[in-house]
Amino acid sequence: MNRLKKRTCQFLVLVTTAGLLTGCGGGTPKLEDALKKTAAYEQETVTSPASDTLGGEWTVIALARSGETVDENYFEKYRANLEKRVKDQEGVLSDNRYTEYSRAVMALKSIGKDPTDIGGYDIEKPLEDFDAVVSQGLNGAIYALIALNADDPDANKDGELEQKYLDYILEREKADGGFSLDDNAKDGDVDLTAMTLQSLEPYQDEEDVKEVIDKGVEFLAEIQDDDGGYTAFGAKSSESISQTVIALSAVGVDCNEDERFQKDGKGLYDTLMTFYQKDGSFKHTLDGESNPMATDQGFCALVAYQRYQDKENSFFDMTDYR
């Protein structure tokens, strides 16, 4: 091989290698690499996961569902922190936000712990108070249904309470096929529609529910912006994309390959990764900085899509908890 050919080959190897690297100018990061980096980032920044929206349950759930290596004491730290909160508050996580219970139940089920005995308190029982749960609106019903079904959807989904939440959710479908937190709103919004589809996953073999899911997917495709993102309440954010990726992965739609969600040759995963930072975190907006909520939701989306690609149980089907 002459020197010119050798140098040309070396150059091509360098270019190819650079294309595989994550970060600015390296193209869309590979899913597996991004997931590993975000898992490491979460453990470095959330060292003692609490019972809370940020730095708490969503971090635990995503790590547990990711299959990535986690410090052996990490999940026990969360359980202990939750137990302390439960005892300090005499079993009451909230008087009016029952998603506090749903989130904790999901986290416990994701790590194989029993939510009916945390420091002597049953934190799943409050979800039996249907009126209190739905006083929070559609959001409350969605996450109660996900939490109740999470450990064994096939066994739990037809229960009287689960069916009551299911009916409540289905009754709130908008004419455009979407869902909204505002019962009086004419149109659906991206985030609540995506969350609704996540809760309906165990029922997608039922014809009437499948029809609602299909309409919801079409709604999410139709309201997508020309640049591949979503605008919710006047703002573009990574969280809306993350929720949609989780939803599509749950109902068997490839968020990056399905033509309905492609814009200028890019799919939803590609668009989500424009918010991704080199350290594994996510930004809330493109011109913003790393954001804890955006990172938690982005991580959940990466895990959900990876599980879809690997043909594993979906993000919220925790019968295979690991």
Go through the PLM ranges and name each one.
Residues 16-21:
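Hydrophobic core
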Residues 6-14:
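Sec-dependent signal peptide recognition
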